[in-house]
């Protein structure tokens, strides 16, 4: 791992234990997501999805490179708990950049987890903050603090006033299509996860002990309703709408829970590979869903 970013305040034994626990849970979330099979257009055990430059082994290697950095995000969140939440976000960037550098070194320059580093870096920092403030780690409270930390993030980073001629894909998606991507999801406190993914996942888990089926059905719901900018990058709005419509159609018929559901999902996978479409944003949100499912729901906060 690259040089660890330290803070002046010594970490307590409890804080270090919590930090390691959060990092381990993030690692499990990322490995659970990538090994889930079959996933339409995504890397899994069956194939490399619509990707020519990555496979399961590379994702696993990348996970082992990025997960330890979650302890650093956590510790910074813990150490800055007295500050206004939105002031902490810029402080996380150097850790994120160092984490990405380790990821790229591990993968030979392939971007496997940039979106996941963004989401889980925020979540890890927020959990550190909550432990410092002696708050219970709950799904909605974690999402509330992520929203607070990312207040006005879209306007600050994606609006026309915040950009110049040298625009990124994220800025292009926002200015041309009004799609805010991972930044918008974070600013909303993972609204898609809270209102779509977690309720579906937890309901199926309560009715069915099969974790894989619950996750695959949840992924279909995310693909149906998430405005995944990864799909826009590969297939423009036409690609996004195609995936959403096909996922909605499959869910209308029962999804993976219907007879022949897994075979239908494999056919969906083959079709997305042929179209070079990969819903990577939804995959990241599925990992976030699995992570948050390990905490009690808590009180709902107003969006």
From Swiss-Prot:
Biological processes, Gene Ontology terms: prosthetic group biosynthetic process
Enzyme Commission number(s) from the entry: 2.4.2.52
InterPro entries xref list: CitG, TriPribosyl-deP-CoA_syn_CitG
Enzyme class: transferase
A Pfam family matched in the record: CitG
Keywords: ATP-binding, Nucleotide-binding, Transferase
Catalysed reaction, written as an equation: 3'-dephospho-CoA + ATP = 2'-(5''-triphospho-alpha-D-ribosyl)-3'-dephospho-CoA + adenine
Keyword ATP-binding belongs to the record: yes
One MF annotation (Gene Ontology) recorded for this entry: ATP binding
Function description: Catalyzes the formation of 2-(5''-triphosphoribosyl)-3'-dephosphocoenzyme-A, the precursor of the prosthetic group of the holo-acyl carrier protein (gamma chain) of citrate lyase, from ATP and dephospho-CoA.
Family: Belongs to the CitG/MdcB family.
Name of protein: 2-(5''-triphosphoribosyl)-3'-dephosphocoenzyme-A synthase
